[in-house]
Amino acid sequence: PEPQLDRFLLSVNMTLPDRQTQSKILMLHAEQNESNGAEEKLINVDELVRLQSKVKAVPVSEEMCQYITDLCESARRQRGMLHSISARAAIALMRASQAVAYLEDNPAVFPEDVKRIVGPVFSHRLVLGDGFDGGVNSSSELIEEILKETKVP
């Protein structure tokens, strides 16, 4: 059911690979079969937990929490939505913003971090209904409008 989508942190828009990339994917899988399925681990559990702790330790100021709240409130005010932004989505946006800040080596979460990740966090949560009359045709266009109308700290 669509409300279950709220449990996913991000929505990733994937397209089909081009011909050359698809061929490489097939070759990788063919080689993997030849090696009896021995898969190389990219990261172990301890390293993953350590990285998660570092991401959660990235500071989020009260001002950034207000900005995230303002974005969520702006999304909730849209009329004609089938589904909108929950409290869980606000937490997801904060955590994803911390991850972006960590990956960008920022000392704290900045508005640019939030703006960079709000699309993947909101896109599967904002479902436009048939009666939606917001002048946009997709959730990604709506997110752009929400970003434009929300004051940046």
Residue ranges and their predicted role:
Residues P1-V58, E62-D70:
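Conserved AAA+ ATPase core "coupling" helix
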Residues S11, S23, S35, S53, ...:
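Generic serine detector
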Residues V12, D46-A57, R76-M81, L126-D133:
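Short hinge/gating elements
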Residues A30-N33, A75-R76, T150:
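Short amphipathic alpha-helical segments enriched in hydrophobics
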Residues T69-E73, G119:
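Amphipathic, well-packed alpha-helical segments that form the structural scaffold of globular domains
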Residues R77-P153:
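C-terminal engagement/docking regions of AAA+ P-loop ATPases
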